[in-house]
């Protein structure tokens, strides 16, 4: 697939889009392998390649789009044998195997040179050992979505602190409702709860150190305090019963029907909430409350990325392409509701007129000073994430098993990281 691809989907040639990338005289071949295989992302990727090609008429762009799931097993071979110039992947610890194998290029100098203005809030998610290895192009927020109408009925306000959270929850439980719906049949939802409780209890840096295997599950007092805070909610009946039997979608009717008043979830759930019949007047959003005062707040915002393989042949063109896709105007267009329908990572971008996207953008751009986490099953190595999330689900059902759970997680840590 070459540079003659049409850019009709995004209209990226609109006035004002000709960034500094257009000034570079690029030639040769630029090979891109992308996993943006679903219909809307595919159209975005094809249009990006087409527009970049129009900006650089002497550059031949070869775009290969592969199945998103298949790419997870193919990427190592692609990076090792005849690597392309640009690939899609994910941020944080999902980069680590390819950084450690010297398969992703260190692009710290490009970050330091100012190529990525407006991306400083997520620089940490592209950093390993103080070096940067990629750039982000889209993400979405997590947080607490709640039934505003029920909060109003009960006289509740959005909680800013853990004490306010617990007080609210007691009022909700006393009204005959659960504070939170959740479905842990697929374990990742429990991982989201641990992410937030641990980041709010101990801080983003502690959470990332745990993800890297640097802290003991059994000996670190901060980890135990996280579970103690979680147990406060469990013991007061904050969560719906039998959540281990439900997927996140199957748990949504508790929220829709008013049997539970809130859902800790990613912004992708809003469409399902609206489709269930709830109006925007009935739903609102707040940032997960502060637990330990003074800690900069970290947030879960799973981030998709572009990287330059270490064996790239056209590094100059790859650099310009990364600068292009992270520019504020391009990020605005590719993330709007007609395309990816997510959040631009560039703080200078604009967003669609949607209250939840607006709140998420404001939170991630201006109130996530602690750092951007990628989610439990992305930040922890795959095997550790699997064992860990099994333990987290078990804790939510059988909190008295905590010591046994932590012993298993510690055994896994010693085996997996060492």
Model-based region annotation:
Residues 26-37, 59-64, 86-87, 133, ...:
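Short, well-ordered beta-strand elements
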Residues 29-47, 66-68, 375-380:
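Extracytoplasmic "Venus flytrap"
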Residues 47, 51-119, 127, 149-160, ...:
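Extracytoplasmic "Venus flytrap"/periplasmic binding protein-like
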Residues 84-85, 115-149, 178-182, 295-298, ...:
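A structural signal for short loop-to-beta-strand junctions that line the ligand-binding cleft
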Residues 90-142, 166, 172, 193-195, ...:
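Hinge/lid segment of periplasmic solute-binding proteins
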Residues 96-97, 266-280, 291-390, 416-418:
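C-terminal lobe and pocket-closing loops
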Residues 129, 133-137, 142, 166-215, ...:
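Extracytoplasmic/periplasmic solute-binding protein
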Residues 171, 212-243, 288:
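Glycine-centered hinge/linker elements that transmit conformational signals in sensory
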């Amino acid at each position: 697939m070459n540079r003659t691809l049409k850019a009709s989907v995004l209209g990226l040639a609109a006035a004002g889009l000709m960034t500094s990338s257009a000034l570079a005289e690029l030639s040769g071949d630029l090979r891109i392998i992308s996993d943006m295989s679903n219909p809307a992302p595919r159209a975005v990727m094809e249009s990006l390649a087409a527009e970049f090609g129009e900006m650089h008429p002497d550059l031949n762009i070869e775009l290969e789009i592969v199945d998103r799931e298949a790419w997870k097993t193919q990427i190592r071979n692609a990076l090792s044998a005849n690597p392309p110039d640009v690939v899609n992947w994910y941020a944080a610890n999902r980069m680590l195997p390819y950084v450690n194998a010297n398969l992703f290029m260190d692009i710290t100098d490009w970050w330091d040179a100012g190529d990525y203005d407006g991306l400083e809030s997520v620089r940490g998610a592209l950093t390993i050992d103080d070096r940067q290895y990629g750039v982000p192009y889209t993400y979405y927020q997590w947080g607490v979505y709640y039934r505003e109408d029920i909060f109003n009925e009960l006289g509740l306000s959005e909680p800013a602190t853990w004490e306010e959270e617990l007080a609210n929850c007691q009022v909700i439980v006393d009204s005959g409702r659960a504070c939170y719906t959740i479905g842990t049949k697929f374990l990742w939802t429990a991982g989201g709860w641990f992410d937030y409780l641990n980041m709010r209890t101990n801080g983003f840096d502690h959470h990332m150190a745990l993800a890297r295997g640097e802290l003991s599950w059994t000996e670190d007092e901060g980890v135990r305090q996280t579970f103690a805070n979680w147990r406060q909610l469990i013991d007061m009946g904050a969560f719906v019963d039998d959540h281990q039997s439900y997927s996140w979608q199957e748990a949504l009717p508790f929220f829709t029907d008013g049997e539970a008043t809130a859902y800790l979830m990613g912004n992708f759930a809003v469409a399902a909430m609206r489709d269930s019949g709830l109006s925007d007047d009935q739903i609102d959003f707040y940032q997960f409350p502060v637990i330990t005062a003074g800690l900069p707040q970290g947030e879960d915002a799973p981030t998709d990325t572009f990287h330059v393989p270490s064996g790239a042949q056209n590094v100059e063109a790859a650099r310009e392409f990364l600068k292009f896709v992270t520019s504020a105007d391009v990020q605005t267009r590719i993330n709007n509701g007609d395309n990816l329908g997510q959040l631009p990572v560039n703080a200078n971008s604009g967003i669609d007129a949607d209250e939840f996207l607006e709140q998420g953008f404001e939170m991630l751009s201006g109130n996530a000073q602690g750092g951007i986490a990628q989610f439990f099953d992305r930040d922890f190595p795959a095997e550790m994430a699997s064992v860990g999330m099994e333990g987290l689900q078990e804790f939510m059902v059988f909190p008295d098993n905590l010591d046994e759970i932590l012993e298993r997680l510690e055994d896994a840590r010693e085996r997996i990281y060492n």
